[in-house]
Each structure stands twice: as structure tokens, then as C-alpha cells.
Amino acid sequence: MAGRTFLLGICASALGLAASIPPQPTFYKNVLPVLQNRCQECHRPGEAAPMPFLTYQEARPWAKAIREAVVTRKMPPWPADPHFGKFRNDRSLSREEIDTIVAWADSGAQEGNPADAPKPAQFVDGWGIHKPDAVFEMPNEFAVPASGTIDYQYIVIPSGFTEDKWVDEYEARPGNRQVVHHIIAFVRPPGSKWLKDAQPGIPYVPVKEDREKRKQRRKDEDSGPPPELLVGFAPGLPPGTLRPGQAKLVKAGSDFVFQMHYTANGTAGLDRSRLGMVFAKQPPEERVYTASASNDKFEIPAGDANYEVESDITIQEQTLLVDLMPHMHLRGKDFVYTAFYPTGESEVLLRVPKYDFSWQLFYYLADQKVLPAGTRIHCVAHFDNSPNNPANPDATQTVRWGDQSWEEMMIGFFDVAMDRDKDPMDLFVEKKHGKSGD
């Protein structure tokens, strides 16, 4: 994993670079602005990247590796097709920025004059968001064994909120990145019957069920308010940050539920993950809600290199589209979101032609898009279950929906903004697809 992630953040535009590439760029004048503005968020102590790029002494040994990564566009991690959609968190480098880094590396990676350096970037220690107003941490460390399959662990943490809270920045952070595959932090509102047997602070594993028991449980859960996804942690996933006037709602008396996916790596470890959030300074005009178009009714045949799965969801009232995030596992190949409007027109919102499980990103629209009432979001994904997929755990197996990485998922997450007093449960109608070919 380190080989894929060591250059996380060599990305985006450098402020103040000259229109023409200087014949001998220097670190302080030409390269540091790129690292500082986009890269040091992760390339600093305690963050995702395994080495910091805060100083010349730290970055200089990696000059040739940085050059190779940006020339081949392996870095920055931005797999979206540039022909569809504009995104405010676009990490891709311009041609000029690439040429500047190449010229710097090829001319000996010169240090230059420290007086040319911009002021040091300011970060909140331990967070990718502003200083949190509230932090919720697992009450106890979870012991991850050195080997074996680890069931998803659900940990309920009461919010203690006595009044509704509006949240406009939020981040889930693993305590031990070596063993945490992903975190999903849910808000469980008062009256919810989801995971009703879980005790606060105690890791809970849902009981295995047959079809009838699962059907009855879901019917029971549907009689109460559903949980809402707040934020997740996964490789490459940035913290959640919303624009002014928009926020997510955490109702008074809610619980937070951490869904923890641990992966054994040959060495036993301990984890104590946490959730941080920044409260909106005033009630927002719009509530942001995470929805999804998913399909769990598929069977990917052994050896199939291009198996197609579709999902759809229709939006009943006008909303604003905030962001998109496709999710698959190791056999995921490509993913496309298309909006079908009630006028009969359609538009590709996002195309990820080379999906990479190691880089799961939210794509925040540069200009949030109006979705008229009756808009259908249609997702199409392809999976490569052939021996030619180097990430494939086993090309001889038929693959179905499942939590573990060697199983598969097909989920098109997206956030929408609506009037803050609207009930999001009234907004969506999801089409149920059968197996491909049905």
C-alpha cells in the first residue's frame, strides 16, 4: 500500500507560478508552493502519507520519485474523466505544474533562496478540518489480531446532545491506519431501531440471519427513523467540508455509530478511532443529506472481465447536487453517473474510467447542480473478475455482494442539499434491479 500512497497530495495548482517555466526552478520559489497548497495536508507528521514534505531536506530525497509520479499521472490521485463535470477538489496537475516539477528534478532539485519561500501553511494538529467543536472517540482500544477475517464491528457512542446540532465540517480518523480498512460514521436518530441490541461503547457484531429473519428485522427497523451516513474514512477519502449556508443535521439525543472494518496485516495491533466535527455558526438555509443508488442483486461470473451492474434512484422534489462518490471493491473497473431529467435530456455527471479501490474519493461539484423534481440518477458499473485484473483476489470464484474486500459492492453515493425543514425520506424512490440479464 505504501508504494501506492507515498506521494498522496502532489496535486492541484500552485499559486503564483510564472507563466513560463524557469530554466532552473528552485524548491523554495517554485516547488514548495505546490507542496504547501495541496500536498502538505497529508505529507506531514501523523497524516496518511508515510513521509512529510514540509522542508527541502524532507522532499529532496524524493525528487526523482515525484517526477516519475506526476509525469505518469499516477499522482495526484484523481481518476475522474476530465471531459465530464468540474469539481472543486480536482487534484490533477496542469501541464505547467508538471513541467515545473520535471525541470526542478532534472536540474538537480536545487534548494534556492529560503527568502523566496511562502509563509508556512497552518494546519490543525491531528485533523484535516478546522479545530473540532466536538470529538467522539471509541471508549476502548480494539485489539486487531495478526491474522484471520474480522467481522465488521459496530460501536455506538451517544452524542449527549441536548439540542439539535448543525455540522458543516466532519472527519473520521483511524487510530491505527495499518489495520483500519475503513470507517463509516452514522448518525442514529432518537427512536431508531437499527442495531437496537448494541450497547454503548461495546463492539457489536450483528447476528447471522436467514432470509426470513433478515426480512423481519428490516421490517422492524423500517418502523423507526433510519440512520444517516455522516462521514467515512477510506484510502484517499477527504474530510467532509460544506459551503456556507449548508450543513448536516444531528438531532438532539442521537447516537453516533462507528462501522469499523479492520484488516489483519500479519501483526497484531490496537485501534481507537475517533470522529471530529465543526458546528455551523448559525442554522443553515439548506440541509445536506447523503443518498445512494445501490444494487446488491448481482453475481459476477468467474473470469468475467466486464460484468455490468446498474442502479437507479429518482428524486421527487427539486434539490441541489453537492457531490458524488462511487464505491466498489477490488474487482471494480469503471463507474458512471448519469442524470436523466424530466425534460427527456440526460447528462453524464461523473465518469471514472479506471476505478481504483485504493483511491475512493468524494467529487465535490465546483458549481452545485439543480436536480429538478423527477430527475433519475442512473449508475452503471463494470467489474473485472478475470485473471488479468492484478487486484483480483480469486478469478475462479463467482462474486456476490458482501462486506469484505474479496466480495463486492455497487453503491453510487451522492449528497444533495434541500430546504432545511424538508424530510429527506420523502425525496427518493429507488428502483430495485435484479441480477444482470433479469
Label every model-predicted segment.
Residues 30, 323-324:
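Short, hydrophobic/aromatic alpha-helical segments in well-folded domains
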Residues 82-87, 117-166, 171-320, 326-438:
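Beta-strand-centric surfaces of beta-sandwich/beta-rich domains
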Residues 16-161, 169, 253-259, 264-266:
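Aromatic- and Gly/Pro-enriched helix-to-coil junctions and flexible linker segments
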Residues 4-16:
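Bacterial N-terminal signal peptides
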Residues 1, 16-22, 430-438:
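Basic/polar N-terminal segments that are highly enriched at the extreme N-terminus
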